[in-house]
Amino acid sequence: YVLIPLIVFLVSSCNVTTGETSIAGKYCDDWATKDANGYRFSNNVWGKDTYQNGTDYTACITVTDDYPAGTVIEWSWPSYRGGVRSYQEIYIGRKPWDTTGTNNSPFPIQINNLKEFKVEFDLERSYSSTGFNVALETWLASDPDGGQSAITDEVMIWLHEGSEPSPSGGNGNSANLALTPSHEVWRNASHSGWDYSAVVFEADYLSGTVDMKLILDEWKWLGWVSGEEYILDLELGAEVVLGEGSLTINKFIVTAN
């Protein structure tokens, strides 16, 4: 398998180009999914259990022709603590459960071949509930074309931590990231069949840049990853446990090569 390095600049302010069908609108169906401008959104309600859309909860994503800029993610879930209900999101690449990835994606990239991997963002969140986080996520796999069985690692960056959910595992580890602002690192080496790690900022970090390569380099130094793993995607969304709220995405740019 030959991997050709790519550089992708996904600019959040670009308008729909001539000939491209507009996806502007409000989407409230479970798992509603659309692609445009190199990004995919998914109204991901993976933990809904027996709750019924429109009766027990609502979950919507509103997009404009400036997509992903101006995207608004909204939700309203019962107050019962039953685990993560949804991770409504925008992403580039291919999730392990996807058949195909997004257009012009730089992924998959093997960690050992990674030269640059950063995420720039500007976000706004609601304050009506504390039952959610705002997080970046990337999946690592042993096979660049693999599905769930190929997953080796789930890496999350919590830009906002609410009262729910809690990171998996513990934070008493040896990770020492040259990363600001202040943060903790959590790890669970036996989470759902793969390793889980999370960088959790101690205060909201909703506008700025995260150097994902710096994080993966540290994980490699610690032996948490070997460097042979493939980065499949980069996701941005809100993990919701309970209550109502919203997330507005003003900017979301991923650079990877």
Each predicted region: which residue ranges?
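Short, hydrophobic/proline-enriched secondary-structure or compact coil segments at domain edges
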Residues: T71-W75, F117-L123, L136-T138, I231-V240
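Sec-dependent signal peptide recognition
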Residues: Y1-P5
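Extracellular-facing segments of soluble proteins and assemblies that are Gly/Ser/Thr-biased and enriched
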Residues: R85-S174
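Long, compositionally biased interface segments
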Residues: S197, F201-N257
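Ser/Thr- (and often Asn-) enriched beta-sheet segments in non-cytosolic proteins
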Residues: T17, T58-T64, V72-S76, Y91, ...
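Bacterial Sec-dependent N-terminal signal peptides
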Residues: L6-A24
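Aromatic (Trp/Tyr/Phe) and Gly/Pro-enriched flexible surface segments
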Residues: G19-F107
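Short helix-loop boundary/capping segments
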Residues: S142-K213
